[in-house]
C-alpha cells in the first residue's frame, strides 16, 4: 500500500538526502585520501577522481548490508506501527540534523564521524516523537567508548608499525635492500586486510552476505600470498631498476649543478663601489673590475673578518669609477643621520652562482665572527627580485637600525629574527635580496638631512654561538629519501583506494540509510521495511558523496593530510594500513570503532613518533571536541526539525 498522501515528504527527503550525501563527501572522504594528498603521492584532482570511482563502486556493492543497521539498529521501529507518519517525519529530521552538523564541521575543517552524526540525529528525533523508551541506549554507550578506543587502539597499532619500518628501513644508510625485501610483505598485508574487510562486510550483489568467517579469512590469505609472489618476482626487480635509474639521474644532476656553479663564478662580473668614509674625501673612487680573481678576493673578505668598508650613495660614475659626494662617512636616512660603517658587497650577477656563493660566505662569517648583538629595531625593505627567499634563508638580510628613540613605529608586516634578546614575531614578512638592499641603502641617503641612526646588517648582528636546535634534525626527517618515496608511493595509493572502496560501502548508509527507510515505508505502507535496499538509491548516495568531495572535500583533506602533521609516503602507508587493520580486528571482536577516529589517531601517533614538535595539538584538541559534541549537536538539530514537523506541519496535512 503506497502512502500517496505523504509523497511530499518523500520528495523533501530525496532533496535533503542528496545534501546529506554531499556533506558526507565533503567531510568523511578525507579519511581515505587525506594522507595520500598530504604526502604528495597524488594530487587533489587525482584523489578526487580515484575517490569518485571507488566510493561509488563501494557504495553500490557493499552499502546495502550496512544500511540495515542505520535503519533498524538505533531505534525500535515497531513502536511506530500506528504512527507511520511520525517515523517518516523522523527520518527527514535525522537527515537534516546530520547534514547541517557535517556541513558546519566541513566549513571548520574538522573531520567528524558520519556514523555518529546520523546516530545522534536519529536519537534526537526519537526523543521528541515517543520519548526515551524508543532508543537503543547501548548504541550510545558504544559510541562514547569509541571516542577513546578508536584513536588509542589505532594510534598504538600505527606507532608500532611505523617504528618497525623506521628501524629496519628508514634509518638505514641504504634503505633499498631492506625495503625491497619488505615490499612483498607490505603488499600482501595491504591486499589481505582489505580483501578480508570487503568480504567480511558482505556484498549482497555479489552473493557474499552468507560467507562464513573462516572461508573469508582463508580466501584473503590465499589472495595475499599470490600477490606477494607477484611482487617478489616482478615488482621488486622493476622497482630496483627504477630506483637505480632515479639515483643515477640525481647524481648526474648534482654533478652538472656543481660544474655550472664553477663556470658561472669564472664568468661573473664583480662591481666594487666607492663607499663614503673610506678615504675621507669627496673624490674618493674605486675603479670597476671584471676579473674573477677580484671577485674571489671580495668574497673571501666577507668570510674571513677583514676590514669592513662602508657603503653609500653613488652620485656619479666616470671613466669606470663610481664617485661618492659624501666625505664624512655619514648620510641621512628617514630623518636621521646615518653612520655608514656597514660592510656590504654589491655584485652585478649574470646568474645566481656567485651570488649564492657570496651568501654562503656571509653565513659562515655570521657563525664564526665574535660580536655582541646590540639592541635592535628593524626595517624591512621592499621586495623586487627573485633572490628574496634564498637570501632570507641563508643570512636573514633585513636592515637593522639601532633607533634609540622608542617612538619609531614598526612596520605591520615586520618580523624580528636576530639576537638572543630579540623577541620573535610570527607575522608574515617579505625580505629583499642582498644586492637590492645595497641599492636601497644608497637611495635612502638623499631622503633626509639630520638624525642619529646607525645601520647594521643581520649578518653582523647574529649571535656568534647560536644555540643548537633539535628541530633541525627533526626537519631532516620530514621528507622521505627519493628511493623510500618510490618504495611506498604506489603502496599508499593502493591502500587509499581500498580504503575509499570500503568507506563508500560503509558511509553511504549514513547518507541514504534514512532515505531508504523513508522510501520503503512509503512504498510498502508499513514500518518493517522488509525489502532489500534498492541499488539505484545506493548509486544516488554515491553520486552525492562524489559531488561533495569535488566541491568542498579539499578543506578536510587539508586538515587530515597537512595541517595535523606532515605526511610522507612511508608514514601515510603506515597510517592507512594500521587504521584499516584496526577497524577490521575491532569490528570482528565487537569493539565499538570509528573509521574517522582511527585515522586521526594514527595520523597523530605517527606524526608524534616522526617529530615531537610536528603535531598540531591545538588542532587535535579541536577535533576531539568536535567528536564530543557531534552526537548531542546533531541530535539537537534533528529534534528541532522533528518538533516543527510533528507539531507545526503534520496536524495540518
From Swiss-Prot:
<keyword id="KW-0739">Sodium transport</keyword>
<keyword id="KW-0406">Ion transport</keyword>
<feature type="topological domain" description="Extracellular">
    <location>
        <begin position="131"/>
        <end position="142"/>
    </location>
</feature>
<feature type="topological domain" description="Cytoplasmic">
    <location>
        <begin position="239"/>
        <end position="483"/>
    </location>
</feature>
<feature type="transmembrane region" description="Helical">
    <location>
        <begin position="47"/>
        <end position="67"/>
    </location>
</feature>
<feature type="topological domain" description="Extracellular">
    <location>
        <position position="1"/>
    </location>
</feature>
<feature type="topological domain" description="Cytoplasmic">
    <location>
        <begin position="554"/>
        <end position="572"/>
    </location>
</feature>
<feature type="topological domain" description="Extracellular">
    <location>
        <begin position="505"/>
        <end position="532"/>
    </location>
</feature>
<keyword id="KW-0812">Transmembrane</keyword>
<comment type="similarity">
    <text>Belongs to the inorganic phosphate transporter (PiT) (TC 2.A.20) family.</text>
</comment>
<feature type="transmembrane region" description="Helical">
    <location>
        <begin position="110"/>
        <end position="130"/>
    </location>
</feature>
<feature type="transmembrane region" description="Helical">
    <location>
        <begin position="573"/>
        <end position="587"/>
    </location>
</feature>
<dbReference type="GO" id="GO:0016324">
    <property type="term" value="C:apical plasma membrane"/>
</dbReference>
<feature type="transmembrane region" description="Helical">
    <location>
        <begin position="484"/>
        <end position="504"/>
    </location>
</feature>
<dbReference type="InterPro" id="IPR001204">
    <property type="entry name" value="Phos_transporter"/>
</dbReference>
<feature type="topological domain" description="Extracellular">
    <location>
        <begin position="68"/>
        <end position="86"/>
    </location>
</feature>
<feature type="topological domain" description="Extracellular">
    <location>
        <begin position="209"/>
        <end position="217"/>
    </location>
</feature>
<feature type="topological domain" description="Cytoplasmic">
    <location>
        <begin position="611"/>
        <end position="622"/>
    </location>
</feature>
<feature type="transmembrane region" description="Helical">
    <location>
        <begin position="143"/>
        <end position="163"/>
    </location>
</feature>
<dbReference type="GO" id="GO:0005886">
    <property type="term" value="C:plasma membrane"/>
</dbReference>
<keyword id="KW-1003">Cell membrane</keyword>
<feature type="transmembrane region" description="Helical">
    <location>
        <begin position="595"/>
        <end position="610"/>
    </location>
</feature>
<keyword id="KW-0813">Transport</keyword>
<keyword id="KW-0769">Symport</keyword>
<keyword id="KW-0675">Receptor</keyword>
<feature type="topological domain" description="Cytoplasmic">
    <location>
        <begin position="23"/>
        <end position="46"/>
    </location>
</feature>
<feature type="topological domain" description="Cytoplasmic">
    <location>
        <begin position="164"/>
        <end position="187"/>
    </location>
</feature>
<dbReference type="GO" id="GO:0031526">
    <property type="term" value="C:brush border membrane"/>
</dbReference>
<feature type="topological domain" description="Extracellular">
    <location>
        <begin position="588"/>
        <end position="594"/>
    </location>
</feature>
<feature type="transmembrane region" description="Helical">
    <location>
        <begin position="2"/>
        <end position="22"/>
    </location>
</feature>
<feature type="transmembrane region" description="Helical">
    <location>
        <begin position="623"/>
        <end position="643"/>
    </location>
</feature>
<comment type="subunit">
    <text>Homodimer.</text>
</comment>
<comment type="function">
    <text>Sodium-phosphate symporter which preferentially transports the monovalent form of phosphate with a stoichiometry of two sodium ions per phosphate ion.</text>
</comment>
<dbReference type="GO" id="GO:0006817">
    <property type="term" value="P:phosphate ion transport"/>
</dbReference>
<keyword id="KW-0325">Glycoprotein</keyword>
<keyword id="KW-0915">Sodium</keyword>
<dbReference type="GO" id="GO:0005436">
    <property type="term" value="F:sodium:phosphate symporter activity"/>
</dbReference>
<dbReference type="Pfam" id="PF01384">
    <property type="entry name" value="PHO4"/>
</dbReference>
<feature type="transmembrane region" description="Helical">
    <location>
        <begin position="533"/>
        <end position="553"/>
    </location>
</feature>
<feature type="glycosylation site" description="N-linked (GlcNAc...) asparagine">
    <location>
        <position position="81"/>
    </location>
</feature>
<keyword id="KW-1133">Transmembrane helix</keyword>
<keyword id="KW-0592">Phosphate transport</keyword>
Amino acid at each position: 500500500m503506497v502512502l500517496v498522501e505523504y509523497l511530499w515528504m518523500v520528495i523533501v527527503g530525496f532533496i535533503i538526502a542528496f545534501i546529506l550525501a554531499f556533506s558526507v563527501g565533503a567531510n568523511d572522504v578525507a579519511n581515505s585520501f587525506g594522507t595520500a594528498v598530504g604526502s604528495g603521492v597524488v594530487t587533489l584532482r587525482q584523489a578526487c577522481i580515484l575517490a569518485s570511482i571507488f566510493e561509488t563502486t563501494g557504495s553500490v556493492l557493499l552499502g546495502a548490508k550496512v544500511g540495515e543497521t542505520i535503519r533498524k539498529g538505533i531505534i525500535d521501529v515497531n513502536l511506530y506501527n500506528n504512527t507511520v507518519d511520525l517515523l517518516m517525519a523522523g527520518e527527514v529530521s535525522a537527515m537534516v540534523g546530520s547534514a547541517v552538523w557535517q556541513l558546519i564541521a566541513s566549513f571548520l575543517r574538522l573531520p567528524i564521524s558520519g556514523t555518529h552524526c546520523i546516530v545522534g540525529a536519529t536519537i534526537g528525533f526519537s526523543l521528541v516523537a515517543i520519548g526515551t523508551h524508543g532508543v537503543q541506549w547501548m548504541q550510545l554507550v558504544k559510541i562514547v567508548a569509541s571516542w577513546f578506543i578508536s584513536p588509542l587502539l589505532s594510534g598504538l597499532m600505527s606507532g608500532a608499525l611505523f617504528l618497525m619500518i623506521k628501524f629496519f628501513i628508514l634509518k638505514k644508510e641504504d634503505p633499498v635492500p631492506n625495503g625491497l625485501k619488505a615490499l612483498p610483505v607490505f603488499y600482501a598485508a595491504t591486499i589481505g586486510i582489505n580483501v578480508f574487510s570487503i568480504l567480511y562486510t558482505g556484498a549482497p550483489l555479489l552473493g557474499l552476505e552468507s560467507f562464513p568467517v573462516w572461508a573469508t579469512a582463508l580466501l584473503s590469505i590465499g589472495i595475499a600470498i599470490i600477490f606477494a609472489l607477484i611482487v617478489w618476482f616482478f615488482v621488486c626487480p622493476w622497482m630496483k631498476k627504477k630506483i637505480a635509474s632515479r639515483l643515477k639521474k640525481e647524481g648526474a644532476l648534482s654533478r652538472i649543478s656543481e660544474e655550472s656553479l664553477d663556470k658561472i663564478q669564472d664568468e661573473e662580473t664583480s662591481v666594487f663601489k666607492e663607499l663614503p668614509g673610506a678615504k675621507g674625501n669627496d673624490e674618493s673612487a674605486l675603479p670597476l673590475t671584471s676579473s674573477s680573481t677580484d671577485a674571489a678576493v671580495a668574497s673571501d673578505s666577507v668570510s674571513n673578518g677583514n676590514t669592513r668598508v662602508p657603503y653609500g650613495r653613488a652620485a656619479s660614475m666616470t671613466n669606470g669609477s663610481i664617485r661618492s659626494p659624501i666625505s664624512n662617512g655619514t648620510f641621512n636616512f628617514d630623518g636621521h643621520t646615518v653612520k655608514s660603517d656597514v660592510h656590504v658587497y654589491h655584485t652585478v650577477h649574470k646568474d645566481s652562482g656567485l651570488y649564492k656563493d657570496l651568501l654562503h660566505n656571509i653565513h659562515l662569517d655570521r657563525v664564526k665572527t665574535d660580536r655582541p648583538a646590540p639592541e635592535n629595531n628593524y626595517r624591512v625593505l621592499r621586495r623586487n627580485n627573485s633572490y628574496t627567499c634564498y637570501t632570507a634563508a641563508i643570512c636573514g638580510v633585513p636592515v637593522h637600525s639601532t633607533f634609540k628613540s622608542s617612538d619609531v613605529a614598526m612596520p605591520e608586516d615586520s618580523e624580528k629574527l636576530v639576537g638572543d634578546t630579540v623577541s620573535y614575531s610570527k607575522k608574515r614578512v617579505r625580505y629583499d635580496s642582498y644586492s637590492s638592499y645595497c641599492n636601497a641603502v644608497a637611495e635612502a641617503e638623499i631622503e633626509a638631512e639630520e638624525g642619529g641612526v646607525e645601520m647594521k646588517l643581520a649578518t653582523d648582528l647574529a649571535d656568534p654561538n647560536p644555540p643548537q636546535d633539535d628541530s633541525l634534525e627533526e626537519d631532516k626527517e620530514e621528507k622521505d629519501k627519493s628511493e623510500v618515496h618510490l618504495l611506498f608511493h604506489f603502496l599508499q595509493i593502493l591502500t587509499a583506494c581500498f580504503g575509499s572502496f570500503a568507506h563508500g560501502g560503509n558511509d553511504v548508509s549514513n547518507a541514504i540509510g534514512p532515505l531508504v527507510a523513508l522510501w520503503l515505508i512509503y512504498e510498502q505502507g508499513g514500518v518493517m521495511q522488509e525489502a532489500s535496499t534498492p541499488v539505484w538509491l545506493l548509486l544516488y548516495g554515491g553520486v552525492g558523496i562524489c559531488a561533495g568531495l569535488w566541491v568542498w572535500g579539499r578543506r578536510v583533506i587539508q586538515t587530515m593530510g597537512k595541517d595535523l602533521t606532515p605526511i610522507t609516503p612511508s608514514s601515510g602507508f603506515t597510517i592507512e594500513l594500521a587504521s584499516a587493520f584496526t577497524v577490521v580486528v575491532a569490528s570482528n571482536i565487537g569493539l565499538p570503532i570509528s573509521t574517522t577516529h582511527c585515522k586521526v589517531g594514527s595520523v597523530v601517533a605517527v606524526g608524534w613518533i616522526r617529530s615531537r614538535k610536528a603535531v598540531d595539538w591545538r588542532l587535535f584538541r579541536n577535533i576531539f571536541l568536535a567528536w564530543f559534541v557531534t552526537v548531542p549537536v546533531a541530535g539537537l538539530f534533528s529534534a528541532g526539525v522533528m518538533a516543527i514537523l510533528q507539531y507545526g506541519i503534520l496536524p495540518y496535512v
